[in-house]
């Protein structure tokens, strides 16, 4: 069997935390395979799109694979927390503006248990403003501003199981002057490497 169709102006609510609005997509359903194409939606007021999301069913698991795109967005701390809460601890963010391209895959059980999450992201960070209350650098940088600004960063993030690798570069404004930085941060379980 095969079923083709589309959804226009769909709405979903997941556990009163994720509100999906203006959902538009084309779907194709076959035996143990589902395809969602030309997906456009708004999740907690943030625009997302995907050219293709493929879902295949094997025994008691669904394997989900796709590309998720975000257009350039100004996000609040609360929006970030709602979208990324299960993956990231959000520091004291004052402002963030970025766009991203994300390849994702994961398994989900019929009881909605997620595992084997893999994310490969390319992020163009236009601006990130953090309140510096998480690390004391005053002894090293006496003129340190309360706010740290990151601008024009190109970032690649790879996440798999308990390992995350972040590589990037861009401008940082710490002491009233801008510097260009390159960085690589790896977190394996609870161990960080810089």
Spans of model-derived segments:
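Membrane-proximal interfacial segments on either side of biological membranes
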Residues: 1-194
